[in-house]
Amino acid sequence: MAHPLVFITGATGFLGSATAVAALKAGYRLRICVRKPSDELQNLLSGYSEQVEFVTVADWTAEGAFRGLLDGADYVIHLAHPIPSGPEKEYYFTPAVKATTALLREAARVPSIKKVVVTSSIAALMPLDGIPSGGVIKEDNDWDFDVDETEDFAASNDPRGIPMRLYHASKLLANQTAWEFRKTAKPPYALVTLHPAFVYGRNPVQTTAEAIQESSNGLLWHAIMTGVPHHSYSRVPGVHIDDVVEAHLRALDPAIPDGSKYLLAAKGGTWKEVADVIQRDYSYLGAKITPDIEEEFLSTDSSKAEAELGMRWRAWEQMVRDVVDQQLEFANV
């Protein structure tokens, strides 16, 4: 009997590549959809050639972009999303909404597909203008998640925060798109969304120390080395990449019902805790982070993922160590 086939997007990235490796180790076959070939990903997966096939779609926003590509698949994991990279709305909003819609619509045409898991973000559980005072981020808050797509996002008092605000807005829009599609189209498959906090840990496709800026690890590394979290989302908590990967595979379990949403966030954690690890174990690093940073992370409640997915969160210390150790390996320290 053939192992289940997963159609997966976003596998060229930090989280996607780690998820792909874990799925292959678990015995799944993968049909990996990329915008263009990736040498880093192909090298990473070279030992699994009999379980992997690649398909290339240059424009994921085109009508029928995925037509026929999901045929025979059992599951879909949609990880792809524009990363924070510039101030243009079109870079974020159009791919986030149109690619999500196109993929969900095509999946509805394929009778073999049992479940679609969409990788959303903690950002999709946070109002664009901030959470209410004393609020706790969780899956079922009755907050205002609307996005004014006509907003002039470039008119900001925090220019460095513009890409993150646009990313936040695009995650809200993509999440709303997914659930609105389920409500109106009533697809035959189950839909599950995962909402990780900022993801930290070893990056399987990072090849240089400088490339850390291409993933969420760059946020942690910047804070460590400069002592200043550099964006307006510095209070957003983190989660270890291995926990997020595990959650993706557990979400494929038939016991996880249609309509499930899961916040993925480690418990506790403060910038002081990060600084303590650095000063204790990496004093030679030249880092500027100090324990007197008073800013605490936003409150979260990820008990639903613990109860239903069986999640047990890795500690902040492991996130810090894994990121720093990989950077030191690139520097041959």
Swiss-Prot record:
UniProt key word Oxidoreductase: yes
Top-rank taxon: Eukaryota
Binding site for NADP(+): 167
Biotechnology: The sphingofungins A, B, C, and D, show a limited antifungal spectrum of activity but are especially effective against Cryptococcus species, fungal pathogens causing opportunistic infections in human.
Membrane-crossing residue ranges in chain numbering: none
Gene3D superfamilies attached to this UniProt entry: NAD(P)-binding Rossmann-like Domain
Induction, per UniProt: Expression is positively regulated by the sphingofungins biosynthesis cluster-specific transcription factor sphG.
Keywords: NADP, Oxidoreductase
Pfam family, one: Epimerase
UniProt note: phenotype after gene disruption: Decreases overall sphingofungin levels.
EC class: oxidoreductase
Presence of the UniProt keyword Lipid metabolism in the record: no
InterPro entries documented for this protein: Epimerase_deHydtase, NAD(P)-bd_dom_sf, NAD(P)_dehydrat-like
Similarity field: Belongs to the NAD(P)-dependent epimerase/dehydratase family. Dihydroflavonol-4-reductase subfamily.
Protein role: Ketoreductase; part of the gene cluster that mediates the biosynthesis of sphingofungins, bioactive molecules acting as sphingolipid inhibitors via inhibiting serine palmitoyl transferase (SPT). Does not seem to be involved in any biosynthetic process leading to the production of sphingofungins, but might be connected to a regulation or resistance mechanism.
Protein's recorded name: Ketoreductase sphI
Organism whose genome encodes this protein: Aspergillus fumigatus (strain CBS 144.89 / FGSC A1163 / CEA10) (Neosartorya fumigata)
Gene from which this protein is expressed: sphI
